[in-house]
Curated annotation (Swiss-Prot):
Free-text comment on the cofactor: Binds 1 copper ion per subunit.
GO CC annotation: cytoplasm
Gene Ontology terms, MF aspect: copper ion binding
Organism, as annotated: Yersinia pestis
HAMAP family the UniProt entry points to: CutA
Family in the record: Belongs to the CutA family.
Reported function: Involved in resistance toward heavy metals.
Protein's cellular compartments: Cytoplasm
Signal sequence segment: none
Location, primary (coarse class): cytoplasm
Residues reported to bind Cu cation: C23, H90, H91
Annotated protein name in UniProt: Divalent-cation tolerance protein CutA
Keywords of this entry: Copper, Cytoplasm, Metal-binding
Oligomeric and partner information: Homotrimer.
């Protein structure tokens, strides 16, 4: 969808303040626990857990391969720093994956719900 299409589509919102934070957890139990804590603090409106991820990376000079659960935290820029700080403080990893992706466009009803859920 082009920018001009987004302007004419009544269900699209351009240049929202929504973000998606990517994070991995070592297992489903810790992923569910972290997701529930973040939702309880209203730092994210929704968290999607994607089990079955395999991550390969170097840690302390050694190639590691781990089963992980990918988490997708849906939030907004107003809550971004608090969300990142909270995850870092409550995550079982010493250095958790924390990547922030801006949401450029989206359905206006979903984005309205997302923002209302974070108030």
């Amino acid at each position: 969808m082009s920018d001009s299409d987004a302007m004419t589509d009544p269900n699209a919102v351009s240049y929202s303040n929504a973000i998606v934070v990517l994070c991995t957890a070592p297992d489903e139990a810790s992923a569910q626990n972290l997701a529930a804590q973040v939702l309880g603090e209203k730092l994210a409106a929704c968290v999607t857990l994607l089990p079955g991820a395999t991550s390969l990376y170097y840690w302390e000079g050694k190639l590691e391969q781990e089963y992980e659960v990918q988490l997708l935290f849906k939030s907004n820029t107003d809550h971004q720093q608090a969300l990142l700080t909270y995850i870092k403080q409550h995550h079982p990893y010493q250095t958790p994956e924390l990547l922030v992706l801006p949401v450029r466009d989206g359905d206006k009803d979903y984005l309205s719900w997302l923002n209302a859920s974070l108030l």
